[in-house]
Amino acid sequence: MEKIKQPVLVLVGPTAIGKTALSLQLARQFSCEVVSMDSMQVYRHMDIGTAKISKEEQGEVPHHLLDIVEPDEHYDASMYCRDALRTITEIHARGHIPLVTGGTGLYLQSLTKGFFEGPPSDSAVRERLQEELDNLGPEEMHARLEQLDPLSAQRLHPNDSYRVMRALEIFAITGKPWSQLLSQHKPENQFANMLQIGLTCDRPLLYDRINMRTQIMLDAGLEEEVRGLLDMGYSRELRSMGSIGYKHMANFIFGDWEFEEMKTLLARDTRRYAKRQYTWFNKDEDLHWYQKESKAEIVDRVGQWLEDQLSKNL
């Protein structure tokens, strides 16, 4: 596959670090269109719990890959890769710069280095596994994966039935763990000119910001948003509804947790998610890390890089 030669900017970092504000600044200054890289912001009706950018801000700067599927629709990294590549091509055709921003590391990997899909699905195997899932439940299927492919089981939540089932299907078809096949996949960046910037800050500051964001979401009406989703018929068992914030509020609404317990666990699990994001992004050698306070330095770096790209094409 021939590499994409037009410039692409990427801005990543953990949740609550301040990516949205900086992405808007960069987009206004350098004629960018933002391509969301968030596995939860693809869902319609899920705005507060995903910290989705406001409609007003979307009106100021074009944003893409927000609100593209319903909460009960399947959407994964391979689909994101397809949609993001198409969107980036369209932005280049308009003479603008794509600014890919978000915190979903798997989406970045699928976009830059391609997505390892494994062998084609086998309908007979899928039907058998689905029947077993219906009879045994997700916890038992995850436990089975833990025996066959512990590395995949470690990174997959028991409620992520789609990926657990896919990992079991791959083992049934090939006799090899998905994690082993994935480790043998040697991808390279399919973009010839991409600048990847990571935002970071001291952990205590980030955790304070996460605690503040938790309160802001609750004050903004997270409970009403989740009740609305439930009233629309979206089950709390859905993958989208099992995500941080929605799962916690549903547990409160159904009486599983008291309010203060829900609030404490929501902040705690968001902090844990931020740690997992750091773990993922720290493995990416193409990322250039900056302190979140260094906005002027980042703007200068982006400006110089874009000038260099322009001069190369003259």
UniProtKB/Swiss-Prot annotation:
Cofactor: Mg(2+)
Organism annotation: Desulfotalea psychrophila (strain LSv54 / DSM 12343)
Free-text function comment from the UniProt entry: Catalyzes the transfer of a dimethylallyl group onto the adenine at position 37 in tRNAs that read codons beginning with uridine, leading to the formation of N6-(dimethylallyl)adenosine (i(6)A).
Gene from which this protein is expressed: miaA
Catalytic activity of the protein: adenosine(37) in tRNA + dimethylallyl diphosphate = N(6)-dimethylallyladenosine(37) in tRNA + diphosphate
Keywords from the named record: ATP-binding, Magnesium, Nucleotide-binding, Transferase, tRNA processing
Enzyme class: transferase
Entry binding sites for ATP: 13-20
The enzyme's E.C. designation: 2.5.1.75
UniProt GO molecular function: ATP binding; tRNA dimethylallyltransferase activity
Protein name: tRNA dimethylallyltransferase
Binding site for substrate: 15-20
Residue numbers spanned by region Interaction with substrate tRNA: 38-41
Subunit structure: Monomer.
Highest taxon of the lineage: Bacteria
Pfam families from the UniProt entry: IPPT
Annotated site residues (Interaction with substrate tRNA) in this chain: 104, 126
Family label: Belongs to the IPP transferase family.
TM annotation in the entry: none
Keyword Iron-sulfur: no
Record GO biological process: tRNA modification
